[in-house]
Amino acid sequence: MSITAVIPARYASSRFPGKPLARILGKTMIQRVYERTAQAACIDRVVVATDDSRIADVVSGFGGEVQMTRADHATGTDRLAEVTARIDTQLIVNVQGDEPLIDPHMIEAAVAPLSEDPAIPMGTLKTPLLNWQEYRDPNVVKVVTDRRGFALYFSRAPIPHPRELAVDDSAVSPASMGLFRHIGLYVYRKDFLLTFAGLPESPLERLEKLEQLRALENGYAIRVVETDRVSLGVDTPEDLVRVEAHLRGL
């Protein structure tokens, strides 16, 4: 089975312009994401998708593969779909371009169900919530799954709600109650991704600003794999300090 990882990378960012080209201990962030992604045993090919020539030049400079996209895409999924249409592959892994510490084992875990079951169109990851602050944080997306590991819902709201317990009870952790956060790494079958990108924005997607709800609202299953590995994403220049500290400690 052919599996391609695509890393969408934009130069423009309201909080951190030029983020993919930020340097982390001598390497650009996009190079670190690319190299970590390539370490996943299941990945045959890694492609950076960008609309910016500066990013393209850097990727080509370190020997990576890059494909240019249109600049008018509304979402990262649309950019991903444009590149996917040109690639001869069966599975597409969407790796975020601001995850310089992405664990290759996370990619392998997300890919496994789709490799084993051709009926699954889409997959992603979840990890236990660490504390009640995360549970209440709307920037931390929560996910609820059924007994087979398929998503029932994703939300920025604190779900599910433990009715019999105050959510600030320090004696009980959210992890001990089976509460999970979503990790934004996705795996798609190529044909499904192209179909998905062509669907109109759904009501719940519009409300929560979560693209994966478009799949659920249209009746598509999303397999969610649990992992205890968590990456450190970079949203602001201050986050670079945490990433560098982690790398120095390795």
UniProtKB/Swiss-Prot annotation:
Q: What class of enzyme is it?
A: transferase
The alphabetized list of GO BP terms reads:
CMP-keto-3-deoxy-D-manno-octulosonic acid biosynthetic process; lipopolysaccharide biosynthetic process
Q: Does the keyword Nucleotidyltransferase apply?
A: yes
Q: Which residues form the signal peptide?
A: none
What molecular functions are annotated in GO for this chain?
Answer: 3-deoxy-manno-octulosonate cytidylyltransferase activity
Could you tell me the EC number(s) of this protein?
Answer: 2.7.7.38
Q: Which HAMAP family match?
A: KdsB
**Can you tell me which family this protein belongs to?**
Belongs to the KdsB family.
Name assigned to this protein: 3-deoxy-manno-octulosonate cytidylyltransferase
